[in-house]
Curated annotation (Swiss-Prot):
Keywords from the UniProt entry: Disulfide bond, Protease inhibitor, Secreted, Serine protease inhibitor, Signal
Disulfide bond entries: 25-73, 34-56, 48-69
Transmembrane segments: none
Function, in words: Serine protease inhibitor that inhibits trypsin at a molar ratio of 1:1.
Tissue expression pattern: Expressed by the venom gland.
Record's GO cellular component terms: extracellular space
One BP annotation, GO: envenomation resulting in negative regulation of voltage-gated potassium channel activity in another organism
Taxonomic lineage of the native organism: Eukaryota, Metazoa, Ecdysozoa, Arthropoda, Chelicerata
Identification of the protein by name: Kunitz-type serine protease inhibitor HNTX-03141017
Signal peptide: 1-21
Amino acid sequence: RLSVLRYYRRPDLRILPQETFEDTCRLPSDRGRCKASFERWYFNGRTCAKFIYGGCGGNGNKFPTQEACMKRCGKA
């Protein structure tokens, strides 16, 4: 299985690897630290399921639609 590492810059300008494809899809749902209430989708190991996202923080296993979730993680 091919995993692709992508990089992003943090505010402190260090370059860090993002979660790999496989890692992202294996993370648990995480509503984050804020108190808003946004419907998002996460991959639960079998399929994509809804959860409530607080609006900030959390992890990469959150998607705006079920379709986006399945496109990224459906074959994980």
